[in-house]
């Protein structure tokens, strides 16, 4: 039934890293973890659903913020141990900091520099609860 899930090399915790990329620009938006259930649900619902290690439960991206990731394509790398999700990022914000991407810092001159702006105040996104 779900033999395709057996092709994935899950880590010792039953997880696989998943990289979300903008399906139009190719920009890396974020990295999160998926388990068998979240990956199967992602395929079935055509939206990104991750496994929250800190909360120990499924995390439907956008369930609190409204910043849903609509799935356009899934890819598995050559070693079968990393997933790429090509997504449409609703609201153009993937990061809980209110930025387009979680990768908003660049290493320059021996330090990490913030180079991407906050598009929306996280307190406004999460009703001051994040």
Swiss-Prot record:
Residues at which Zn(2+) binds: 78, 95, 102
Enzymatic reactions: 1-(5-phospho-beta-D-ribosyl)-5'-AMP + H2O = 1-(5-phospho-beta-D-ribosyl)-5-[(5-phospho-beta-D-ribosylamino)methylideneamino]imidazole-4-carboxamide
Reported cofactor(s): Mg(2+); Zn(2+)
Cofactor note: Binds 1 Mg(2+) ion per subunit.
Subcellular location: Cytoplasm
Enzyme class label: hydrolase
Pathway: Amino-acid biosynthesis; L-histidine biosynthesis; L-histidine from 5-phospho-alpha-D-ribose 1-diphosphate: step 3/9
GO cellular component, one term: cytoplasm
Superkingdom, natural source: Bacteria
Keywords on record: Amino-acid biosynthesis, Cytoplasm, Histidine biosynthesis, Hydrolase, Magnesium, Metal-binding, Zinc
Alphabetical list of NCBIfam families matching this protein: PRK00051.1 (NF000768)
Main function: Catalyzes the hydrolysis of the adenine ring of phosphoribosyl-AMP.
Subunit details: Homodimer.
Protein name stated in the entry: Phosphoribosyl-AMP cyclohydrolase
Lineage: Bacteria, Pseudomonadati, Pseudomonadota, Gammaproteobacteria, Pseudomonadales
Gene (name only): hisI
């Amino acid at each position: 039934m779900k033999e395709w899930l057996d092709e994935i090399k899950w880590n010792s915790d039953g997880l696989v890293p998943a990289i979300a990329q903008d399906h139009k620009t190719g920009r890396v938006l974020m990295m999160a973890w998926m388990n068998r259930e979240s990956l199967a649900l992602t395929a079935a619902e055509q939206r990104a659903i991750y496994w929250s290690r800190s909360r120990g439960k499924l995390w439907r991206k956008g369930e609190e913020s409204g910043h849903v990731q609509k799935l356009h394509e899934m890819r598995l790398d050559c070693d079968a141990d990393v997933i790429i999700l090509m997504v449409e990022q609703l609201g153009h914000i993937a990061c809980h900091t209110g930025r387009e991407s979680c990768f908003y810092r660049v290493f320059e001159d021996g330090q990490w520099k913030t180079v991407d702006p906050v598009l929306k105040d996280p307190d406004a996104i999460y009703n001051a609860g994040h």
